[in-house]
């Protein structure tokens, strides 16, 4: 196999992350279109680290951030994900990471639903200071292997579940396979990753595993996140009443579902997303820094922040920098990365 180096990325801006993800996906899946949105949910300066390691028909990634992040992406037909977090030591704070509605702990594997819908979206919350491992498998090869093994339980879980908690030999071996790869013991047979992933899903022991199934609540959260992100072409931000009408759900139900996952109501989530959209607009290098400074107040108004002084205070409390400092810092955005010998392809 042709060896490819690991690629290390360090980001301090969500726009950088989005552009890198889109480019990386398009390159790996030969021009396939892909869209994603990243929103910082906690306050403070953002620092993230990512290591990507492509292998034939497998894409491995390890990601960490000092801030909690909401990550939304389009469901696709190219790959299926298996994600887990680095195990926590006893006495360490509880993980806040949620993958597609499945609350993660050291025995969790989730992310299957990115392949199970057409025209939908998938969302994750990466908890601050958690380390997330993600293995994406090419779906066509995965499907062929499932069929050849008659792994009907695995297929059913992909369709019905968004995550499982289990501690089996296959789940342990899968995690160790990926961790060893990042530690220099390269995956030489990608088929092993497919077989171990299928084995994790094929286990059907209700006494030892806990699963989160698709539900009206998880679907509602997906719809809320997608709806808030949609560009309304200069219209005022979508209201709770409009969301309620569009999703045919009561305001109480919407807020209850939102608080259960994000610990905030729908309007607070919308404010966080809109604030992040302003930061991305102020960071956009397709416009000169001078023009971004000149139009900063209009940019804030476009995303629903009509009172500039109040917006400035909120912006600083959220990101520990002023809008002007964001523009200056992103005058020339450079993705910081280094390469070292690593994965196969």
Give the location of each predicted region.
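Conserved short histidine dyad/triad with adjacent acidic residue
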Residues: 45, 50, 58-76, 119
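DNA major-groove recognition helix of helix-turn-helix
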Residues: 258, 266, 270, 314-315, ...
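Alpha-helical bundle regulatory/interaction domains
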Residues: 2-43, 89-233, 239-241, 245-251, ...
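Glycine- and acidic-residue-biased ligand/ion/polar-headgroup-sensing regions
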Residues: 65-98, 107
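Short, charge-rich binding segments
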Residues: 51-54, 72-76, 83, 102, ...
């Amino acid at each position: 196999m042709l060896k490819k180096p690991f690629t290390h990325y360090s980001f301090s801006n969500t726009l950088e992350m989005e552009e890198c993800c889109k480019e990386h996906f398009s390159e790996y899946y030969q021009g396939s279109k892909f869209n994603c949105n990243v929103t910082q949910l906690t306050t403070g300066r953002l620092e993230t680290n990512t290591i990507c390691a492509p292998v034939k028909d497998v894409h491995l990634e390890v990601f960490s951030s000092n801030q909690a992040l909401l990550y939304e992406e389009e469901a696709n037909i190219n790959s299926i994900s298996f994600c887990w977090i680095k195990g926590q030591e006893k006495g360490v704070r509880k993980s806040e990471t949620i993958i597609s509605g499945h609350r993660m702990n050291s025995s969790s594997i989730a992310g299957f639903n990115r392949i199970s819908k057409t025209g939908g979206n998938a969302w994750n919350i990466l908890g601050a200071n958690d380390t997330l491992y993600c293995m994406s498998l090419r779906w066509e090869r995965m499907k062929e292997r499932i069929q050849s093994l008659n792994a009907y339980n695995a297929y059913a879980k992909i369709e019905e579940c968004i995550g499982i908690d289990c501690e089996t030999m296959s789940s342990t071996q899968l995690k160790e396979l990926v961790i060893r790869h990042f530690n220099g013991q390269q995956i030489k047979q990608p088929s092993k990753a497919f077989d171990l992933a299928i084995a994790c899903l094929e286990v059907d022991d209700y006494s030892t595993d806990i699963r989160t199934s698709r539900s009206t609540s998880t679907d509602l959260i997906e719809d809320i996140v997608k709806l808030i992100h949609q560009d309304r072409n200069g219209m005022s931000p979508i209201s709770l009443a409009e969301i309620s009408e569009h999703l045919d759900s009561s305001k109480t139900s919407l807020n209850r579902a939102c608080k259960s996952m994000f610990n905030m109501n729908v309007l607070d989530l919308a404010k966080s997303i809109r604030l992040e959209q302003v930061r991305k607009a102020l960071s956009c290098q397709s416009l000169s820094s001078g023009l971004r400074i000149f139009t900063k107040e209009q940019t804030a108004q476009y995303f629903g922040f009509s009172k500039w002084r109040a917006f400035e205070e909120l912006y600083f409390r959220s990101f520990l920098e002023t809008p002007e400092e964001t523009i200056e810092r992103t005058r020339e955005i450079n993705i910081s990365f280094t390469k070292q010998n690593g994965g196969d392809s």
